[in-house]
Amino acid sequence: MSRLGRIIVEAVAHTYGRDEVLRRLSHPFWFQSFGAVMGMDWHSSGITTSVMGALKRGLEPVRWELGIHVCGGRGRHSRKTPDELKALGDRLGIDGAQLTRHSRLVAKVDSAAVHDGFQIYLHSFVVTDDGNWTVVQQGMSPERKLARRYHWLSEGLDSFVDDPHAAIAGMPHETNIINLADHRAKQSRDAQVELVNAGPDAVLPHLHMPLHHDVRSGNVVMSRLRGALTAAANRCPVDFTELLLTRGVGQRTVEALALVAEVIHGAPNRFTDPARFSYAHGGKDGHPFPVPLKVYDKTISVLRGAVDAAKLGNDDKLAAIKRLDREARRMERVAQTGISFDELIRRERKRSADYGGRTVFGWAKNSMSASAERKAPAKNQESAQLSLWSDAVVR
């Protein structure tokens, strides 16, 4: 995960700039799609910790070159955030003390000003050389077996206590909560230190997600997926000649690349069905199918070559990946019929072993039925992973 995550971030930064990386990490739909295309369980609390952990590890070797730094993390790592930010400020010549104050205030708002029953256990602070930042936090409610993710973005942030979130992703609360960061809590804030000002914020779109973790046809906008697959089948012969000459690149790799290309280049409204991106590399829990390691490694190889060439001034391969995304959009408008989602998943499961399919439960085997494709986890294993959303609301 760390290798693929690093390459995608490098591609976004090279094409659109470092600040665009921050904007995308603060967008819950893109974040979920990013995790899914990396092979994470598309519908669990683990996607947040895994994505941020993978980014911190993956970007470490190139962070000074790239100018993007991931501080903090889960549990004890979150408590190291102030020291990491101060050290970063000293090296870059930016105000590390102010960044530390922002980090603490963000953590304090979500843990002390928002009383929603979720205890914060992850705090990841991503900052650029320019001092711009985004924060991804996650809290858990063990009693309800649910998690909630909080997104912050420094760009356009006027107040830390007046509807400051870029988004909050989680299940709607059944009971009343105390949210002192809501603009309607002005009278209460006026009586407390550092809680000032009030004002309305724009209403963000809603993302509704089910309780089940398996990927079903209803979770996917099939026209979008079919467009990507059709573009892969057509191979974009004029634009993709050089890419397709890469040793080992076949139709399945191009299918995965088409979805990765959309994560790099897609507009925000393209990420309303994040489950679709799990088709690129499956999921480590076996949903919708085991991670095809051969395809996964080839995707990394192609992207790595494209990004490295772009750093040397040759953008042809990176531009070719962008054209694949554009071709998928075009085919989406015309490829309205074809293989169904269920048939597509059955096909991937059937050939999973040929692609080096693997889950956290072991390697995929030939001639497996869909129901027996992976060993069922024990009850204590199921309870160890919290559900991120159930009819989730992003607000």
Predicted segment positions?
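Short acidic (Asp/Glu) and glycine-rich catalytic loops that position anionic groups and cofactors
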Residues: 9-14, 208, 236-237, 277-283
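Structure-specific DNA junction-binding interface
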Residues: 1-212, 326-334, 345-395
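Phosphate-backbone recognition surface of nucleic-acid-processing proteins
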Residues: 251, 255-311
